[in-house]
Amino acid sequence: MCGIVGIVGKSDVAQRLFDGLKRLEYRGYDSAGICTIEGGKLERRRAEGKLDNLARELSAHPLSGTTGIAHTRWATHGAPTVGNAHPHIVGPVALVHNGIIENFKPLRDELIAEGRKFESETDTEVVGHLVAREIERGASPEDAVAAVLPRLIGAFAIAILFREHPDLIIGARMGAPLTVGYGDGENYLGSDALAVAPWTQRIAYLDEGDWAVIRRDAIEIFDRDNRPAQREIVESGASSAPVEKGNYAHYMQKEIFEQPIVVAQTLQSYVRPFEGEIALPVAEADLESVDRLTIVACGTSYYAGLVAKYWVEQFARVPVDIDVASEFRYREPVLEPGGLALFISQSGETADTLAALRHARAQKQRIAVVVNVPTSSMAREADLLLPTHAGPEIGVASTKAFSCQLAVLAALAANLARAKGRLTPDEERAIVEHLREAPAAINAALNHDEEIAAMAHLVAPARDVLYLGRGPDYPMALEGALKLKEISYIHAEGYAAGEMKHGPIALIDEAVPVIVLAPSGPLFEKTVSNMQEVRARGGKIVLISDAKGIAEAGEGCMATIEMPQVHPLIAPLVYAVPVQLLAYHVAVLKGTDVDQPRNLAKSVTVE
């Protein structure tokens, strides 16, 4: 959510800044802007809505200048309007900001009492006034920033231009990511390595409280105590090529269809097929001492964690606690020193999850993370890094990253079971074979795309939709409901099938489609009983099952979607596909913005 790009360059930077924003578009935004220093003036262009609107503004009113900053904004304080869009200009400074300044109200009151005028509703403008005030009092840019940063409470990343210093940008971070990039005769900063990848692969990640002075020929980094600091310069590995949709209508559609490939790529790091072994990509995981596992995540990653709870307890017989990251710290969880805490995040920058990780670290927990960005903040703070290999995921609604998380978590559960002596070599070989079958099974599920597209019109008119499942299919019901509400804006809820009679059944009538995830197996008959309860009250059922399940219970359903018969271990990876495709095709029918649904952000970097 929100994105920052900055360049201190050798030639005009406006187009490159815009290109950098395009690379950050996946993070989610509702307005955008660019500011450069041109002829001794701060020149700015801003637009509400998509980057296409900013492109039109730049075409009508071009910008020149070799130093500039750019920003995509996801509104927190103040509506998504041009007036609230970044960059903000306050006298001699212009700035962009990701995050939230929690104490902006008393700071704003202080500044208003001095007679300062505000032009926006944002918390960001407060920072601009504070820095401008220091500059107007005679401070250098460095001294002004050093004086202001200690006054800010919250999580933020900031980039500042100074009108009288046309070859300078100062960036700072606390709780939100910021990266500096080292070029040839010019330097950069960005919210992540992807933003600067076309210009440099040599980057450094700022630590908590760091601020950086970026000039054309040098970058100086200071810590929170204003002492010079050295941060390791690394090769980012971020692709400099733009991520294209190819022949697909949307990034989400493309990413759904990439799942067989990326799950196979991910499993290559965790499975030794010839040895019939699960192997984590670390030299020594020391899992035999784990007596309890704590899992923390948000959104789709949380549902992946719920599936993992079933697997870990079934295979390793290790008890699992799982929490939504935004609640974890505030309930003061009981954590025994030396326990293992597992954090799941696509971006590795999710603010709530990162804060929970640091809380667990303070409680002397060992930290394991499952992330799709191995250079992210969470990855850098982990004791045990478990990367997925989904590649860049542009669609805000997660699909392929979720499936890769499931693949990693299945491998972790099996590895933990072996470490605890709960898995025989033959059982481990069987798990390896089942995991190796997953990509082909996912591909078989994708073959039902046209069928699912044809039945989407049965769901699209609904105002409410229910999803039901038992066992590991219950988290998949939750995930299916989340996908539908995220991109189609239809109210949807997921429930454990056995909970229907405890309240949700009151919602059932002929206008409420009920999506049932029910592979044949030990829990199938129980789920069929719940389907009968729905049918008796006029509910319209869409049954997602295998051929055996559909033969037994498909009669009388509004529609059925046949999945391949698979082992229960990989069923969640397979059954993710139909709920993703159903949500996608319903959203297309309704004409929503599939890749960037309203009010949502890909990388949620505020609490």
Residue ranges with predicted function:
Residues 1-245, 249-250, 258-291, 330, ...:
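Conserved short alpha-helical segments that host acidic/polar catalytic motifs at enzyme active sites
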Residues 66-83, 270-285, 308-344, 350, ...:
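Glycine-rich oxoanion-binding loops at beta->alpha junctions
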Residues 179-204, 326-361, 499-533, 566-580, ...:
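Glycine-rich, anion-gripping cofactor-binding loops and their flanking helix/strand elements
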Residues 181, 304-306, 321-322, 351-354, ...:
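Extended hydrophobic-aromatic, low-complexity segments
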Residues 259-263, 267-294, 363, 384-513, ...:
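Active-site phosphate/pyrophosphate-binding segments
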Residues 288-437, 517-522, 526-559, 582:
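Glycine-rich phosphate-binding loops that contact phosphosugars or nucleotide phosphates
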Residues 540, 553, 566-607:
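Generic C-terminus detector
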